[in-house]
């Protein structure tokens, strides 16, 4: 048994999973989950640079995660960066600064690597899995869609459709004007066009991961406090997403915060919900099963496979 920490550094949020890896029973046993809204990707879509203030937020977050890892006796810390680090021209400078300040080495994942790890993470430990299914991860900077079965990932794509990226690009305020909202709808449709056809075969069983999906599930279910046990495997219906979108597009940030959305997500959840709505509408998806798993679990599985001395047939 080995205990390790896995950190997913996204455009908006950094997430920590501390888990026990059991190579004998091929299992991942979660010990601790944490997340911090860092907004590393603030203005990266326009400037292609991660600024000093965002970097300092990330460093402080990683120092906190490192302390938690130490408290829980994790033997190793594995950290991966996604869309914001992929896009930033000063990526290596940021990574070097982080190493010097925290001792944590960040690997920047390609979109394809992110999609594959998210797919394997989302299905980790799944019982009675459908024959074929699709996984969607709507992040702050990009959206990853992947399809396959429990044995193999068949198809994946990473698109620059993210809640932070498109909010900065297309909304001047919250609530957005009617013109901005419908322009965003058309832009998302344009970006999805030509990329969704391969996933029609897996549209009957779709799993959604990451903060946008879990926040939407929390809002739809009416939970006052986020309870991972109640969110995991929550069935999210298209009509519920459509109704929530109608509500969110007319609310101020303060009103959205009043609904229980964290301050660092309240300004981008309308766009995140719009992205999900258009994905479901264009692909003809009637229901999505929300999972609290994802990239961190995929990273943990990869570490577990290395412990076993095996190579995954997916990664």
What label would you give each PLM region?
Residues 2-29:
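N-terminal basic/disordered segments at the start of proteins
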Residues 4, 18, 43-74, 82-132, ...:
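Helical "lid/coupling" subdomains associated with nucleotide-phosphate turnover
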Residues 6-8, 79, 135-137:
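Class I SAM-dependent methyltransferase core
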Residues 11, 140, 211-214:
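Short, glycine/acidic-enriched loop or turn micro-motifs at the edges of active sites
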Residues 15-17, 39, 78-79:
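Short, conserved beta-strand segments within well-ordered enzyme catalytic domains
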Residues 25-44, 69-70:
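Conserved ATP-binding subdomain of kinase catalytic cores across diverse folds
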Residues 141-147:
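Acidic, divalent-metal-coordinating active-site segment for phosphoryl/phosphodiester hydrolysis
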